[in-house]
C-alpha cells in the first residue's frame, strides 16, 4: 500500500481552508465550490481544527443556529489528529476505521500540506487490488492453458 505523500500527489488544487473567526456559511461555501466535505481551519499558518459538513449539520442546522452568524470556531473539531506524508495509507485506513474519521489533515514539519479523505484511501486500495489481479492473471496465463 502507498504512503500519504503518494495519495496527495494524485490530488489537484489548492489547500481548502478557512479561519476560526470566519462564519460557518463561508466554510460551507468553500465545501460547495470545491466539491469537498471538509475544510481545514488555519489561523496564522497553524492548523487549529477541521470542520465537516456533518459538523455544520449537527451543530448549526439541527439546533436552528444561523450559519451566517455562527463562527467556525464554535463547530470545528479542534486540535485534530494528523498524519505525516511518509505515513502508510494502511495506517490511515486503520485509524479512520477505529476512530470514525473521514478526513485526516497532513502535516510536514508542522506545516499543513493537505488532507487525506477516506475516498483517497479507498482509491488506493482499489489500485492495489487491480495490480494484484493483473499479476495473478499474468502468472496464470504465463504457462498457457492447462499449465
Question: Language-model segments: which ranges?
Answer:
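Tandem CBS (Cystathionine beta-synthase) repeat/Bateman regulatory domains
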Residues: 1-147
Amino acid at each position: 500500500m502507498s504512503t500519504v505523500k503518494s495519495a496527495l500527489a494524485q490530488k489537484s488544487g489548492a489547500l481548502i481552508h478557512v479561519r476560526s473567526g470566519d462564519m460557518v456559511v463561508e466554510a460551507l461555501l468553500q465545501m460547495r465550490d470545491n466539491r469537498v466535505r471538509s475544510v481545514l481551519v488555519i489561523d496564522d499558518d497553524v492548523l487549529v481544527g477541521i470542520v465537516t459538513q456533518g459538523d455544520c449539520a449537527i451543530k448549526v442546522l439541527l439546533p436552528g443556529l444561523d450559519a451566517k452568524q455562527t463562527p467556525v470556531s464554535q463547530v470545528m473539531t479542534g486540535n485534530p489528529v494528523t498524519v505525516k506524508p511518509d505515513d502508510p495509507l494502511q495506517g490511515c485506513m486503520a485509524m479512520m476505521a477505529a476512530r470514525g474519521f473521514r478526513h485526516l489533515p497532513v502535516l510536514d514539519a508542522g506545516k499543513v500540506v493537505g488532507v487525506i479523505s477516506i475516498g483517497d484511501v479507498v482509491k488506493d486500495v482499489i489500485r492495489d487490488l487491480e495490480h494484484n489481479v493483473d499479476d495473478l492473471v499474468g502468472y496464470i496465463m504465463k504457462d498457457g492453458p492447462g499449465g
